[in-house]
Design a protein with these regions (language model features):
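Hydrophobic beta-strand positions in extracellular immunoglobulin-like domains
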Residues: 146, 162, 191-193, 208
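Short beta-strand elements
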Residues: 178, 211-223
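Substrate-binding clefts and catalytic carboxylate motifs of secreted carbohydrate-active enzymes
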Residues: 1-164, 170, 181
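Short, aromatic- and glycine-rich surface loops/edge beta-strands on solvent-exposed regions
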Residues: 199-210
Length: 223
């Protein structure tokens, strides 16, 4: 265990596909020539109609990767913190589309600010589990924990709910806890998944009652 704090440097840097609608924002001396070249190449391959899908899908994947990596840091007892390159795209050296904001600090529409704060904040509640893809009728197990840098948060109540996309609640667990420094193991939860006839989305939602501390995980239940 290190005796001095270790802070990770520029973690993440997950790329998103270019959003060609951004080209029209460059109204001054700086032009998005790189985006224009990318668009031209895509058009030559007959794939330009898929550009919007490429942008949205790659963006959602990048957001999920950032969430996974930041939560890994928050769960670690051996790291003192982390630094990401930026939450906006970096256009200073070539093309680095690594942000959830574009080069103009505008949202790309991939995630809201409140959703980002679920896993990037001074207090983050999290769940550990083996897989995001679950078999119908099986048992889903998760461990819940809190990374807390709020001096006024001494205790609280965790509310953990697993819900299907149609609103049906599979199960709910409430657990009081005492905050133990910066890291608190709250409890283990277990839910029996229902039988389904098609791939079905489920959401594992966590919140600390009476606070803005919350998080959620999108899961898939398969027949």
């Amino acid at each position: 265990i290190p005796e001095v704090p270790i802070v990770t440097h520029e973690i993440g840097q997950y790329e998103t596909y270019p959003n060609f609608k951004e080209i029209e924002k460059y109204t001054g001396s700086l032009k998005a020539r790189n985006f224009e070249v990318f668009r031209e190449r895509l058009d030559e391959k007959g794939l330009l109609p898929l550009a919007e899908d490429y942008f949205k899908c790659s963006g959602k994947l990048a957001v999920q990767c950032y969430k996974e990596e930041m939560e890994a840091v928050f769960r670690s007892r051996l790291l003192g913190g982390f630094q990401i390159l930026d939450i906006q795209d970096f256009s200073g050296q070539g093309t680095a589309l690594v942000g959830v904001l574009d080069a103009f600090m505008d949202s790309k529409g991939l995630i809201t600010d409140s959703e980002w704060r679920e896993f990037c904040n001074d207090a983050v509640v999290m769940a550990r589990f083996d897989s995001y893809v679950l078999e119908a009728g099986s048992s889903f197990k998760a461990h819940t924990e809190l990374c807390n840098y709020r001096p006024d948060l001494k205790d609280g109540k965790l509310i953990c709910t697993l819900t299907l996309e149609n609103g049906d609640v599979i199960g709910k667990v409430e657990k009081n806890f005492i905050a133990e420094g910066n890291y608190t193991d709250i409890c283990d939860v277990e839910f029996t998944l229902p039988q389904v006839t098609k791939n079905t989305k489920a959401v594992l939602a966590l919140e600390i009652e009476g606070t803005d501390i919350r998080n959620h995980y999108d899961l898939w239940v398969i027949p």
